Amino acid sequence: MATQRMLQFVTKSKEMPVKRDADDRRDDFDEIYREFAEEKAVEQASRCSQCGVPYCQSHCPLHNNIPDWLMLTAAGRLQEAYELSQATNTFPEICGRICPQDRLCEGNCVIEKSGHGTVTIGAVEKYITDTAWDKGWVLPVVPMQERTESVGIIGAGPGGLAAADVLRRQGVQVTIYDRYDRAGGLLTYGIPGFKLEKDVVMRRNDQLAEGGVKFELNCNVGVDISFADIRAKHDAVIIATG
């Protein structure tokens, strides 16, 4: 039954979220594209051809389970779609906004190659995760069992934050050190708001903190604290400085 909702690319055209009018955009740095409405996200997800060999997944650096969460979205099972996207990606709503889908998943979509227009994978990924935040489905990490091992992470950019998320899910005690006053690295300081609004990054930082990740900000390693001191405090150290 679920597959009958799919393969709709022959009757439904590719559509992107509505772009905000230029007259509105020139007065702010808010994101350029509006959110999909639910019915439009369902429609666009249903265009997936459910390939036996999903090139979208194999060309994704994270190997996200794209066909399955598209199928769940098409079926209206958005919470399950979010949980599946989160299983392989710490920041699905951020990747949905800034990942170069045209060169990766969408650029290798089979129906794009056949002239039907790619599935709008990034826009759907953004939609299901933003919906998860709105519905309260995104919760702080609660490990099944706390462990005594401690890991220090130098750098609060996307690599450091993703490592912290994975380690906390395993119950490891994590402290992140960063010289800036806010976590996020390039996500916070390098990407303009019209591509990635900063509250999207901050809510992920807050989620990690609520899940037990400790942040030592305004802490310049080598100036405010030595590497030797960090090494002495932890069982292992990850250097994630970009």
Region annotations inferred by a language model:
Residues 1-150, 198, 237-242:
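Ferredoxin-type iron-sulfur electron-transfer modules and their immediate structural context
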Residues 82-89, 124, 187-236:
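N-terminal Rossmann-like dinucleotide/flavin-binding domain of flavoprotein oxidoreductases
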Residues 90, 157-158, 182:
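Residue-level detector of alpha-helix initiation sites
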Residues 150-175:
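N-terminal Rossmann-like FAD-binding beta1-loop-alpha1 element of flavoenzymes
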Residues 172-188:
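Glycine-rich FAD pyrophosphate-binding loop
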Residues 173-175, 235-238:
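Beta-sheet entry/capping signal
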Residues 178, 215-217, 239-241:
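General beta-strand structural signal in soluble alpha/beta enzymes
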